[in-house]
């Protein structure tokens, strides 16, 4: 691209015609922009100029006499800056004829904005460096202000060219050098500007898959949505044939909001997706409704995927595109939100002991209800960006009552190799309401029968806190309860008082409750979820059953709005209770709601008890052995 005159060694002539080909801008050696490109012309050559050593380089003001008044300002302002920036090696050369800059005017105008952006970025990174006289001359004249929509940002910041910044008063996303945004996570949340790619239905319970398969499901969902969304750059360049089992796990895609720039708000309570154009909330997933999240994997560096349940999409994998290396930052923030939520519980367990915040879909088939992570005892997640809200110890199809009270999610901010990994440290903590210390995960099957604290098989029920110990409850039942069916009780339920604390329960209450239930016509004994739903025909139908997978759990199954609801009646302390009241027994609860025509409220939905399904209608039920 440069030619040296063979007839004379006194100077070096630059032929403008050689620069007519603009393809040189794509060569690798010109892709790096350095501060040396705007320094003095003699700085790059220790021995002076390349041409005549005895001559001194002509100053830039000498350009003015050779040019018209209008062109002199433009050339001195634009041409030297663009030329020296794009071709750093030309900084050490002396131009034989300054008038040739007129020929480069058109070429420089095309690259003017790029060079200014890079120079602006370099000056931001080195603010203490004094400007040379040549650089000051390059900026003479009324230089236009850089467009804020095109100024480059650091990798962990928001990309203004893809999504506008949050409005005033909103917390800006943190960078990796900043401290943990605890005040934002505990408050309104931390905002990230990302691109929503859509979601794809997850048909199979994630609980039944090991960690490797769950990662394959996430990556396959990312690949499918990248192929379906126009303009998406696929994370996996070489598309491999999907594994056969993925066809049974992933279902249809929902591209209603795909390709939309959204604001992701991460807090200790939920993940919120908001459209930046019209401030419409696309989705609001409570923390307990999220199965697991992954981000920053080697093959999906620009994407964050999380599986959540909501009434619209049911169980679905939602994909977010995070450019400029923001994916690892987003998944780390989500992990910190999990950790902070657990710490909140440790400080005030009475407020969170039975708190249920998620709104999930009821009535799904029994093998599809609980995609709660790490249900295999002793199984630990591999490294690679997997985090989970629902790590549990029990190898059953039910989740732990409070997802954060029986587990400890460890965040490892100092370990770069595990920056996106959140491991289960549940063996170090002691579950509330269990009178015996846990020796480890090996003894978790002993907890299966008596210490399941979920109020719903399908966890939708909002519950509060326990009141009294089951020891006194079991001791007073024999004298306080009348003989016969407890349906005839007219006693008002006990109201839950705020600030009441839970005391250790007693396993003696469970046989006592089972014996009482055998006297009830609506109690069907051990009955699976699917079998119970087949008996529910009309709205208002209900029955009481004992869980097949978790003996000792007594469930009220009812039909409301065509959907089956499953309410766990007895808490870990042996109390029969709802959100606001504590009842003497199951019959007392049913009679109270039927006589007063009151619904059982469950996370905004209602369950009304109208027609009991009697056990004699279930021909497969055998009489109890006494």
Curated annotation (Swiss-Prot):
Entries under InterPro entries matching the protein: CEP152/SHC-Transforming, PH-like_dom_sf, PID_Shc-like, PTB/PI_dom, SH2, SH2_dom_sf, SHC_SH2
Subcellular location: Postsynaptic cell membrane
Database matches in PROSITE patterns: PID (PS01179), SH2 (PS50001)
Cystine bridges: none
Expression by tissue: Expressed in both brain and skeletal muscle; widely expressed in brain namely olfactory bulb, cortex, hippocampus, striatum, thalamus, and brain stem (at protein level). Only expressed in melanomas. Weakly expressed in normal melanocytes and benign nevi. Highly expressed at the transition from radial growth phase to vertical growth phase and metastatic melanomas, when tumor cells acquire migratory competence and invasive potential.
Region (CH2): 1-185
Entry GO terms, CC: postsynaptic membrane
Domain SH2: 522-613
CDD domains from the UniProt entry: PTB_Shc, SH2_SHC
Region (Disordered): 38-76, 119-182
Biased composition (Polar residues): 120-139
Keyword terms of this UniProt record: Cell membrane, Membrane, Phosphoprotein, Postsynaptic cell membrane, SH2 domain, Synapse
Pfam families linked to this entry: PID, SH2
Residue ranges, annotated region (CH1): 370-521
Ranges for domain PID: 186-369
Subunit structure, interactors included: Interacts (via PID domain) with phosphorylated MUSK (via NPXY motif); undergoes tyrosine phosphorylation downstream of activated MUSK. Interacts with GRB2; the interaction is dependent of Tyr-422 phosphorylation and increased by EGF.
Primary role: Activates both Ras-dependent and Ras-independent migratory pathways in melanomas. Contributes to the early phases of agrin-induced tyrosine phosphorylation of CHRNB1.
Protein name: SHC-transforming protein 4
Gene coding for it: Shc4
